Amino acid sequence: MEQMHVRIVPMNADHLEEIAALERVCFSRPWSRNMLAEELENQCAAFLTALDPQTGKVVGYAGLLVAADEGYITNVAVFPAYRRRGVAGQLLKVFCDFAAGQHLAFLTLEVRPSNEAAIALSRSYGFTERGRRRNYYDLPREDALILTRDFGEEANA
């Protein structure tokens, strides 16, 4: 499938309805519109929206929480019609560039072992498996793989 170059912007209130709909499509325990709105006020959070450059519609989004020198990717989601076109990778690249530029020690994320596409994408950006949270997800019940990319040496190079 052809790669799609999206416009990545900070999430704002205008995106919340579409992102809440995306959450419902992608996750068994979706974040609500109100939960997403709270993140707009969170000084430790960075949420990005991927927009179709032709239509301006939301095609994906991702969230990052920063605590001290640690980054936690909370969400990465892309509408099914836009998957396998590089959208999630573009979002992940922005967060990796941010982590390196801000001298974060690492970025980490959790993913279902059954989500082979997300695991492959994360590995392509240098994430490696560091652990497993047993029975972390439900609907269906599944472990979470903990994938981490270290930036300590990169940031100090």
Which stretches of residues belong to each language-model region?
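Short glycine/proline-centered loop/turn elements that form peptide/ligand docking sites
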Residues: 92, 115-118, 135-140
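Conserved active-site tyrosine of GNAT-family acetyltransferases
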Residues: 122, 127, 147
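Acetyl-CoA-dependent GNAT
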Residues: 3-4, 10-83, 92-98, 102, ...
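Conserved catalytic-core motifs of GNAT/GCN5-like acyltransferases
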Residues: 108-110, 128-144
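Residue-level recognition of the GNAT/N-acetyltransferase active site
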Residues: 79, 83, 112-114, 139
